[in-house]
Design a protein with these regions (language model features):
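Conserved small/polar residues in nucleotide/adenosyl-binding loops
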Residues: 128-129, 133-135
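Active-site- and interface-proximal helix/loop "cap" or "latch" segments in soluble metabolic
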Residues: 47, 52-54, 58-121
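Contiguous domain-boundary segments centered on the initiation and propagation of an alpha-helix
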Residues: 1-35, 98, 116
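Catalytic cores of large soluble enzymes that bind and process phosphate-bearing ligands
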Residues: 3, 84, 123-127
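Structured beta-strand/loop patches that form or line metal/cofactor-binding pockets in enzymes
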Residues: 21-60
Length: 136
């Protein structure tokens, strides 16, 4: 299996599985995101131990790509600090906008790098809206 097939499988698995699509009863951070150009809406819900993210989930509706991207990022940010999650969101948005991103930065994205070929899709940017509020 080549990398493109692996990336496609990651996206399909998260789009179909939706294991991270649920409310967190004990979330201490809830960040909404809305994309007026396509109508996608999510609420990213996080449980932290003060600084580290110990659980992540989301609710909302949108296309398969936005739902899969949010689900993958939920998996990716667990165990990270809020600042690290914000940095990952910045790298992710630069990646999908085809801006300069180093190999070292791409490694930080984990499975979220699967979206590298989803260029300039506004629904993927919705995730950035929610994650960008974390560093407050």
């Amino acid at each position: 299996m080549n990398m493109e097939e692996i990336y496609s499988q990651i996206i399909l698995d998260h789009s179909r599985n939706q294991a991270n699509k649920h409310e967190l009863a004990d979330a201490d951070i809830k960040e909404p995101g809305h994309n007026p150009s396509c109508g996608d809406e999510i609420v990213l819900e996080l449980k932290t131990d003060g600084e580290k993210i110990v659980d992540a989930a989301f609710t909302g509706d949108g296309c398969a790509i936005s739902q899969a991207a949010t689900s993958v990022m939920c998996d990716t940010i667990i165990g990270k600090s809020k600042e690290e999650a914000k940095e990952m969101a910045d790298i992710y948005i630069r990646m999908i906008k085809r801006e300069e991103v180093s190999d070292e930065e791409l490694e930080k994205l984990g499975d979220a790098v699967a979206f590298i070929n989803i260029q300039n899709m506004p629904q993927s940017c919705l995730l950035y809206t929610s994650l960008s509020g974390l560093a407050r």
